[in-house]
């Protein structure tokens, strides 16, 4: 599946936030001023219309989870079909992606690295190899690193970084065995307050 291959820090500067969570690996400020827009001196950010705010929020979340436009729209359509709050459904679908769950469990330092682990067949779901980053993980699914991949230094480094932050309450992880359980779907209160999913729903509802 296609994915964005351009400069990621530029996207983070455009959205004004660390989209790819590289600050967990190294200080992103050491590479660029995250609060400044792209450009030699950082272009002045214009005041946005309601539509502009909605579009920026959609782009921010889409890029954060590494999803292209068509797939992101499909996630919205699916979330609208499900019972309950559409915005919360959308975030749960994104959080349930295998590459994201691998990241949440700490096996990858970033979502991009976690996606690569999945694509390179380093991840097992309930004992079977799954190499589709968008695979939908369900409650009680067991996620593990394949035996022959456990010696990869980047996985050990990622787990070391993950050990410095709080493990999400909706997963349980055994770092020694390099496996974890997706215990439940995250609730809205579990997720980042920096995301305003209502703006995305308003955008797609037009």
Swiss-Prot record:
One CC-aspect GO term: small ribosomal subunit
Source organism, top-level taxon: Bacteria
Pfam families xrefs: Ribosomal_S4, S4
Keyword terms of this UniProt record: Ribonucleoprotein, Ribosomal protein, RNA-binding, rRNA-binding
Molecular function terms, GO-annotated: rRNA binding; structural constituent of ribosome
Protein's GO biological process: ribosomal small subunit biogenesis; translation
Domain spans labelled S4 RNA-binding: 96-156
The UniProt record lists the keyword rRNA-binding: yes
InterPro entries, alphabetized: Ribosomal_uS4 (IPR022801), Ribosomal_uS4_bac-type (IPR005709), Ribosomal_uS4_CS (IPR018079), Ribosomal_uS4_N (IPR001912), S4_RNA-bd (IPR002942), S4_RNA-bd_sf (IPR036986)
UniProt xrefs under Gene3D superfamilies: Ribosomal Protein S4 Delta 41, Chain A, domain 1, RNA-binding S4 domain
Role this protein plays: One of the primary rRNA binding proteins, it binds directly to 16S rRNA where it nucleates assembly of the body of the 30S subunit.
Subunit text: Part of the 30S ribosomal subunit. Contacts protein S5. The interaction surface between S4 and S5 is involved in control of translational fidelity.
PANTHER family from the UniProt entry: 30S 40S RIBOSOMAL PROTEIN, SMALL RIBOSOMAL SUBUNIT PROTEIN US4M
Family from the record: Belongs to the universal ribosomal protein uS4 family.
UniProt xrefs under HAMAP family: Ribosomal_uS4_B (MF_01306_B)
Name under which the protein is recorded: Small ribosomal subunit protein uS4B
Annotated organism of origin: Psychromonas ingrahamii (strain DSM 17664 / CCUG 51855 / 37)
């Amino acid at each position: 599946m296609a994915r964005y291959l351009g400069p990621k820090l530029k996207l983070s500067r455009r959205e004004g936030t660390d989209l790819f969570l590289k600050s967990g690996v190294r200080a992103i400020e050491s590479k660029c001023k995250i609060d400044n827009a792209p450009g030699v001196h950082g272009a002045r950010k214009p005041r946005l219309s309601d539509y502009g705010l909605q579009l920026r929020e959609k782009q921010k979340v889409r890029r954060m989870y590494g999803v292209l436009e068509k797939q992101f729209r499909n996630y919205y359509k699916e979330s609208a079909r499900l019972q309950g709050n559409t915005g919360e459904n959308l975030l749960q679908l994104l959080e349930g992606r295998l590459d994201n769950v691998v990241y949440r469990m700490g096996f990858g330092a970033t979502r991009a690295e976690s996606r690569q682990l999945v694509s390179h067949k380093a991840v097992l779901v309930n004992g079977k190899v799954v190499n589709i980053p968008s695979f939908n993980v369900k409650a009680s699914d067991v996620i593990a690193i394949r035996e022959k991949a456990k010696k990869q230094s980047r996985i050990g480094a990622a787990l070391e970084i993950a050990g410095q932050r709080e493990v999400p309450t909706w997963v349980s992880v055994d770092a020694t065995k390099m496996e974890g359980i997706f215990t439940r779907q995250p609730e809205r209160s579990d997720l980042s307050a920096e995301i305003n999913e209502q703006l995305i729903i308003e955008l797609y509802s037009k």
